[in-house]
Design a protein with these regions (language model features):
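Short, well-ordered coil/turn elements that cap or connect secondary structure elements
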Residues: 45, 84-86, 155-157, 178-179
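Caspase-like (clan CD) cysteine peptidase catalytic core
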Residues: 47, 103-124, 128-174
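Short, glycine/charged-enriched secondary-structure capping and boundary segments
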Residues: 65-67, 105, 134-137, 175-180, ...
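Stable alpha-helical elements in mature extracytoplasmic
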Residues: 68-75, 98-105, 145, 149-152, ...
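Active-site-proximal C-terminal subdomain of hydrolase catalytic domains
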Residues: 54, 79, 93, 160-250
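Residues that flank catalytic or metal-binding motifs in active/ligand-binding sites
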Residues: 132, 180, 204, 259-261
Length: 270
């Protein structure tokens, strides 16, 4: 039967329902779910340091490159777009990139490194190979041997990325790569590296830093940020395919080693 409410303003109060007691829990209580680990700490803009070297015009009768200097400017632009401070970036272009200046620049990276810093070393230019060894070819032909380069870069504390763009570039990873030091190179130790006159960059640096990073074509998971591995995975097969018909030396196959996790330029882990 429906309950009729009069117009007297009185309110009908229903009897409370009786809720039976809950049965006791059977078995052990479920274990708490583990919380995801916090993200690794990242180097602040104050703790990011870069030495960028690019040589197009060499002293004397050494043949010029197409993209050495442009590569250096490209890398700098990508870093600035990712929040790096201009006063933490040292540029050595053409006549500035003497053998002495490069050696001093590597000592500068060492001196400014600490357990909380991230450091980038980038070289784009000629590489000389002799007697099974590789040499960075500075503007003034004051060659820097691979053993000296590796020794200097191994002295960097914190985490680091060393990027070499030149012929036989992977030869500079002579014990340099480690879980805290990523190494990338434009070609294997027995391969040449090439340049693209249409873009004005070396093939590898243009595809990695311009297409992969700056244009974000390497952003495979579409999260708006391109990691080094994403950019490398985008650029490496394209560089090899782009140079596949080069004769007599054949294509270049980019090289990657070291590192213990994703590397993002906007928040490099330390």
């Amino acid at each position: 039967m429906a309950l009729l409410l009069g117009l007297t303003g009185a309110t009908a109060v229903a009897s409370p329902s009786v809720i039976p007691p809950l049965p006791p829990l059977l078995g052990p209580r479920p274990a708490p779910q583990p919380q995801p680990p916090p993200p690794p700490p990242a180097a602040t803009p104050e703790d990011r340091w870069a030495l960028i070297i690019g040589v197009t015009d060499y002293a004397g009768r050494v043949k010029s490159t197409v993209g050495g200097a442009n590569d250096a400017r490209l890398v700098r632009d990508v870093l600035l777009r990712n929040g790096w401070r201009e006063d933490r970036i040292r540029m050595l272009i053409d006549g500035q990139a003497t053998g002495q200046a490069i050696a001093e620049g590597m000592r500068w990276l060492q001196a400014n490194s600490s357990p909380t810093t991230f450091s980038l070393f980038q070289f784009s230019g000629h590489v000389k190979q002799r007697g099974g060894r590789e040499f960075l070819w500075p503007y003034d032909s004051a060659f820097l041997a691979d053993t000296d380069v590796v020794r200097a870069l191994q002295g960097i504390r914190g985490t680091a990325w060393s990027s070499f763009s030149g012929c036989e570039a992977a030869g500079f990873d002579d014990g340099l790569s480690s879980p805290r030091h990523r190494v990338t190179a434009s070609s294997q130790v027995d391969e040449k590296s090439y340049e693209d006159p249409q873009t004005g960059y070396s093939v590898w640096t243009g595809m990695l830093f311009d297409e992969g990073f700056r244009q974000q074509r390497g952003d495979a998971n579409r999260d708006g940020v391109t990691s080094l591995d994403e950019a490398f995975d985008y650029a490496a097969p394209r560089a090899e395919n782009f140079t596949s018909d080069q004769q007599p030396f054949g294509p270049q196959t980019p090289y990657r080693a070291g590192g213990d996790g994703p590397l993002r330029l906007d928040s490099p882990r330390i």
